Amino acid sequence: MAPAASADHDMDVDMIHDEEDDQGERLINEEYKTWKKNSPFLTALTWPTLTVQWFPDVKEPEGKNYKIHRLLLGTHTSDESPNYLQIADVQIPKVVAPNPDDYDEERGEIGGYGKSGDVAAIKCDIVQRIEHPGEVNKARYQPQNPDILATLCVDGKILIFDRTKHPLDPTSTGKVNAQIELVGHEAEGFGLNWNPHEEGCLASGSEDTTMRLWDLKTLKADSRILNPSRTYRHHTQIVNDVQYHPISKNFIGSVSDDQTLQIVDIRHSETNKAAVVAKRGHLDAINALAFNPNSEVLVATASADKTIGIWDLRNVKEKVHTLEGHNDAVTSLAWHPTEAGILGSASYDRRIIFWDLSRVGEEQLPDDQDDGPPELLFMHGGHTNHLADFSWNPNEPWLVASAAEDNLLQIWKVAESIVGKDDGDLPIDELDR
């Protein structure tokens, strides 16, 4: 009789797990329905994209009530379908006077999150496709010339495309015509960053545990193949992300599965040891880093341990602060382009969180504590699967594009009533003291 009892117990456990899975799916679907009502724009892509970035330019067609922004996207298709590097035009309505008809009783405001009388005018169209070998792990434009695009491939190569030398729609010959191939990595990677201080230079990180630097200006006239100008072997495990310091032109940061944040000084010839090494800040792999563009010493790190670390580079023996609010690995980070203390993070928990570091340490009422720490400003829960990437729009404050493994590209904006500053907010330059 004992085996039968054991079988019954196993069936009960399976039923409980099935019920939990069903409840989880129902919760995800309900959240999605809510956000679908409130998001300015949701579009189902034919294939998911692992990468998204707003271009820096914006056009204002004469006589139109919208502006045209552009997005850089990729594809992640099945093996049978070709992959593309893609550019999309996004029509965003111009700011219009508040319409009393848009008053929302529940929020007590006109319009609000993603609400506008011109929402229907938002439109997203793919305007150029460039054939790509396999999925696009990451794509980024060169800041000095946004027509020059770099992509990370599944075989470890980095491809450089000049989009002006490619048709808007390829003939699907299966032939990839990149202008330059950067060869050196021995495995795929997701770390890619252009040098904001010097045109034609970029850094990359890979599963081969190396960080490599490249200088397109050294390419020989009769060649399409470029080798790295320098290879760093200061990490012991996968290098997940790399970034040039936006202020100090000689520093490059990298993070790794070895749970360290490391900063190299390119003025030094040493390639096996970093100038700055931050250890013991996380309990699992570090997936991303982001230097604060308004503070020379502040940097954030995102980890698989579900937390975000805030560091002062003058003393990396311990973190300045830890941001806690995600329920799964944190995979992406980006500071707001104009608000000095605002940090965005994306996670496998399907959420994007905006953090306001000026509110660190603020006192909370007991009821408010249930909503998270005081610095948790806003949480976007509209995706139904893991977040792949997100990007702040540099021209429209608080406008964000986000992409997830659910094939959805979302373009959304937070209501001003949510992100308004308080008089008692801490200045960003006081956080790093």
UniProtKB/Swiss-Prot annotation:
UniProt KW Mitochondrion keyword: no
Subcellular location: Cytoplasm; Nucleus
Any one Gene Ontology BP term: chromatin organization
One Gene Ontology CC term in the entry: cytoplasm
WD repeats: 131-171, 184-224, 234-274, 281-321, 325-365, 382-422
UniProt KW keywords: Chromatin regulator, Cytoplasm, Nucleus, Repeat, WD repeat
Positions bearing the site annotation: Important for interaction with HAT1: L298
Main location: cytoplasm
Region (Interaction with the histone H4 N-terminus) residue spans: 367-371
PROSITE patterns: WD_REPEATS_1, WD_REPEATS_2, WD_REPEATS_REGION
InterPro entries reported for this sequence: G-protein_beta_WD-40_rep, Histone-bd_RBBP4-like_N, WD40/YVTN_repeat-like_dom_sf, WD40_repeat_CS, WD40_repeat_dom_sf, WD40_rpt, WD_repeat_RBAP46/RBAP48/MSI1
Task performed by this protein: Regulatory subunit of the histone acetylase B (HAT-B) complex. The complex acetylates 'Lys-12' of histone H4 which is required for telomeric silencing.
Record's subunit section: Component of the HAT-B complex composed of at least HAT1 and HAT2. The HAT-B complex binds to histone H4 tail.
Family, as annotated: Belongs to the WD repeat RBAP46/RBAP48/MSI1 family.
Name of this protein: Histone acetyltransferase type B subunit 2
Protein source organism: Gibberella zeae (strain ATCC MYA-4620 / CBS 123657 / FGSC 9075 / NRRL 31084 / PH-1) (Wheat head blight fungus)
Gene: HAT2
